[in-house]
């Protein structure tokens, strides 16, 4: 019973993240939605690791790797966002045309 609830929560978080990523016009909001998607994937990894392979912790180790990857993605994304805001004075996605100055 608990397994289904966790999977429902994970699907719900993933759906919110995808919806926010598609409809977002702000780069910060898009980064937050991407982090939400990665966290829902981590929730699935830990849940399935506990359900199928509780002795070897392969899913837990992979989830820690995904958390480290998400932290690096957030740091790089925020630094790029800071540079775009400094040069363009806007963080809106539809106003960012990088092909022409």
UniProtKB/Swiss-Prot annotation:
This entry carries the following GO cellular component terms, namely: chloroplast thylakoid membrane; NADH dehydrogenase complex
Q: How does it sit in the membrane?
A: Multi-pass membrane protein
Q: Which cysteine pairs make disulfide bonds?
A: none
User: What GO MF terms are annotated?
Assistant: oxidoreductase activity, acting on NAD(P)H, quinone or similar compound as acceptor; quinone binding
Compartmental location:
Plastid, Chloroplast thylakoid membrane
Keyword entries, A-Z: Chloroplast, Membrane, NAD, NADP, Plastid, Plastoquinone, Quinone, Thylakoid, Translocase, Transmembrane, Transmembrane helix, Transport
Q: Which GO biological process annotations does it have?
A: ATP synthesis coupled electron transport; photosynthesis, light reaction
Q: Name one Pfam family in it.
A: Oxidored_q2
Q: What is its EC number?
A: 7.1.1.-
Q: Which residues cross the membrane?
A: 2-22, 32-52, 61-81
Q: What InterPro entries does the record tag this protein with?
A: NADH_UbQ_OxRdtase_chain4L/K (IPR001133), NUOK/Mnh_C1-like (IPR039428)
Q: Which reaction does it catalyse?
A: a plastoquinone + NADH + (n+1) H(+)(in) = a plastoquinol + NAD(+) + n H(+)(out); a plastoquinone + NADPH + (n+1) H(+)(in) = a plastoquinol + NADP(+) + n H(+)(out)
User: Its principal location?
Assistant: plastid
Q: Which family does it belong to?
A: Belongs to the complex I subunit 4L family.
Quote the function comment for this protein.
NDH shuttles electrons from NAD(P)H:plastoquinone, via FMN and iron-sulfur (Fe-S) centers, to quinones in the photosynthetic chain and possibly in a chloroplast respiratory chain. The immediate electron acceptor for the enzyme in this species is believed to be plastoquinone. Couples the redox reaction to proton translocation, and thus conserves the redox energy in a proton gradient.
Name of the molecule in the record:
NAD(P)H-quinone oxidoreductase subunit 4L, chloroplastic
Q: What organism is this sequence from?
A: Zea mays (Maize)
Lineage at the top is: Eukaryota, Viridiplantae, Streptophyta, Embryophyta, Tracheophyta
